[in-house]
Amino acid sequence: EQSEVFFDAIGEEATFKDWSREFRVREPELVDNTLSEPLRECWGAIESAAEGIEDETKRNELMDGARRLRELHGGIKLFLDQEDEDSVYWIEKGGNEGTSLSLNAAPVNVASLLRPILFGPDKSCIATSATLGTGDDQLRYFRERVGAEHVPAVKIGSPFDYQKQMEIYVIKSMPDPRDDDYEKMLIHWIERVLIKTEGKAFVLFTSHRLLRSVAEEMEDFFDEHGWTLLAQGSGMPRQKMVETFREDINSVLFGTDSFWAGVDVPGEALSNVIVTRIPFAVPDHPLTAARLEEIEAEGGNSFMDYSVPEAVIKLRQGVGRLIRSKKDSGMVVILDNRVVTKRYGKTFLAALPNAPVKIVT
């Protein structure tokens, strides 16, 4: 009951904009901390009960529960007090209906935190990933972000022969994503490309709304060809979607953020990755907005110094879904003409795998 009262008060103070799931909290003490004492009483009662239990397993389980309550107590206090001026605080709606609320806090810049922990003079640390770079062999962007400015960087070549295994197509004739006819042309090109590979594709979106709209408009297309459409947000768990995609050889998966990275589908099942839009981070997300503000305050260019490098890394992750072994092959299609029409587009092209690139006009 106390929890409901507390989060009802949080919900009344959070004024979410249309389509937004985040509300940035800029001042401390948004609401009264009515959970402080109930949580304290609860973990105290659990600890007292645990002291009288001889069974070690049961006693440890109770003590672990008490520890989690103490952590919740500390987290709520941290959020409401906002004592760390170098962090950003926000409330986020969760669940399909957006009915659950979570309290969030994160440091705007992690470099000062990680530098002494991982990269100090008496520390030994190796940071490795296939997508740390933004086209810069010295990995300068990553090193500055994590406080490893003075750490040597090594770029190791790929074991894959991208010249033979991958083809990249950039559709220059696509309208700007902000134009009214963008969605219509997006559907046109997705259909055209899917026919070429008979499905077997990941279609990567940056917007849940656009994904749902395109999926709805293309229902007849998929029925006509007898291909299964797996659309994120339809109720199927992520892992189940991936398993179904692997088993259904001509299926097509529409995914957003969580499908740009961390998904492996080697073999013929994935022969085509379609990128609907450059994956720029939403600039009004509280954490992104705070980082952009910090860069501008220090005299930097927030778009080129943060938005572009972050999007380059995510694009590389998305494109990287295609080739997962030396036996894989296929095509990547980018349906965002900004990679060839905007000055910053060359940064994206330079960061892509060394595969043949064809500009479709």
Locations of regions flagged by a protein language model:
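ASCE RecA-like P-loop NTPase motor cores
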Residues: E1-T361
